[in-house]
Design a protein with these regions (language model features):
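Helicase motor core with emphasis on the C-terminal RecA-like subdomain
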Residues: 1-136
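A conserved SF2-helicase RecA2
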Residues: 122-164
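Functionally engaged cysteine thiol sites
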Residues: 166-168
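Single conserved hydrophobic/aromatic residue that forms the stacking wall/gate
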Residues: 175-183
Length: 183
């Protein structure tokens, strides 16, 4: 379903964009699809060499690539004001991460789109990633349990965002700011 949506949605988009994926494998698959469909796309994730990540990032900044397909490893420190769309191919781990990544679009003040594709199975995938990440942490069993409990709550919060019937911007602002001024 997501692949079909992407194939029909992408031709309608102008300019460059970022597609966020949950895993390195998913990043590779989506990037390969885009290139096969004729879109100049690059990839960015922790499994690539620093040299390849830098080369792909530079190509994206210079508009040599229309789309950057990436995990959340891409984003911090990236200042490309003319990003016209951000698409989350899967559910992000939390509202803060989503808000940060969505904020990559339209920094030049021109219209931009942010789309989040969500299926219930995304929750299970993200829970598995959280559990794996927790296992890798070097801390006490008690600290791991606390970390995982908090991570699960953040995941429930982003799931709640997906089902919100109200203003999504307001939801994000209320969630990320103790006292939003203009919602």
């Amino acid at each position: 379903v997501k692949r079909r949506f992407l194939r029909s949605w992408l031709p309608e988009q102008n300019g460059c964009g970022i597609i966020y994926c949950a895993t390195q494998k998913q990043t590779e698959e989506v990037c390969n699809d885009l290139n096969a469909w004729g879109y100049p796309a690059g990839r960015y994730h922790a499994g690539l060499t620093m040299e390849e990540r830098q080369r792909n990032q530079n190509a994206f900044i210079k508009n040599e690539l229309q789309v950057m397909v990436a995990t959340n490893a891409f984003g911090m420190g990236i200042d490309k004001p003319d990003v016209r769309f951000v698409l989350h191919y899967t559910l992000p781990l939390d509202v803060e991460g989503y808000y940060q990544e969505a904020g990559r679009a339209g920094r030049d003040g021109l219209p931009a789109k942010c789309v989040l594709l969500f299926e219930r199975r995304d929750i299970m995938q993200q829970r598995q990633l959280l559990e794996y990440s927790c296992e890798q942490r070097e801390c006490s069993a008690e600290d791991k349990k606390l970390w995982l409990t908090n991570a699960y709550q953040r995941l429930r919060d982003i799931e709640s965002y997906c089902f919100t019937r109200g203003c999504l911007r307001k939801y994000c602002l209320l969630y990320t700011s103790p006292s939003p001024r203009d919602t």
